[in-house]
Amino acid sequence: MIQGSIVAIVTPMHADGALDLPGLRKLIDWHIAEGTDGIVIVGTTGESPTVSVDEHCELIRVAVEHTAKRIPIIAGTGGNSTSEAIELTQFAKDVGADASLQVVPYYNRPTQEGMYQHFKKIVEAVDLPAILYNVPGRTVADMSNETILRLAQIPSVIGVKDATGNISRGIDLMRLRPKDFAVYSGDDATAMALMLCGANGNISVTANIAPRGMHQLCDAAINQRVAEAIAINNKLVPLHNKLFIEPNPVPLKWAMAEIGLIPSGMRLPIVPLAAEYHDIVRAAMRESGVLQ
């Protein structure tokens, strides 16, 4: 089972929006050195909606090849087209990804039965472990615990990223899940609480800029070292809060560029962080110790 701090890694881009693949390789090496336990490539934070299919595949390929099995690579291959998700997932399997991340279909607003059939079709078509991804704040389609538990009966559906931020709902899911089905937080602000209640890790935005701290937090919380987890989380809280002052990944990319981790590029309709928030994010970085 994949567990711990799983970074939802950014896609480095130059000022003109071109992919920075050497920069991605450097980021991967840095994450491994800092203790990151796994990487989600081309997820929400990786700007999956604004990369082409060819770029999407290239990012997965580069991540898998460069990581070389040092840590697991989870390929973001989900979408609101079942057939396209199958094609991307097949590519991820072919190049050696360890698992796929399958987001609830967005915009077309499927029913619970539609969600079930969508995911079932993908995992039947491609023999690659799949992690479901429920993020109703972005998809406007909320997968119920009942549907998640129904899908959890399929052996290749190995877990869910719960980005609802609803701790009581997550606890109820964990109470009813099969023993080998993983639950990951997808919300940095509530991740510690969910892990202390039994979640297997955090698929994290904050880990992009504080990988060692997030690894330490996950290790402490998963292993029930409560006081240690609280102390680490308290240090990271300013980042949990201010990295979402505008929609992710805008504040995150600004913060990472500020300390030289990546260039400042992103793609429309995402635009750079408003100047009025620069000092606010910078202060959070200082408070959390990622900026001196």
From Swiss-Prot:
Signal peptide: none annotated. InterPro entries: Aldolase_TIM, DapA, DapA-like, Schiff_base-form_aldolases_AS, Schiff_base-form_aldolases_CS. Its EC number is 4.3.3.7. Coiled coil: none annotated. The record marks 44, 107 as: Part of a proton relay during catalysis. SMART domains: DHDPS. GO terms for cellular component: cytosol. It is an enzyme of class 4 (lyase). Its main location: cytoplasm. Pyruvate binds at residues 45, 203. Pathway: Amino-acid biosynthesis; L-lysine biosynthesis via DAP pathway; (S)-tetrahydrodipicolinate from L-aspartate: step 3/4. Belongs to the DapA family. Catalyzes the condensation of (S)-aspartate-beta-semialdehyde [(S)-ASA] and pyruvate to 4-hydroxy-tetrahydrodipicolinate (HTPA). This is 4-hydroxy-tetrahydrodipicolinate synthase.
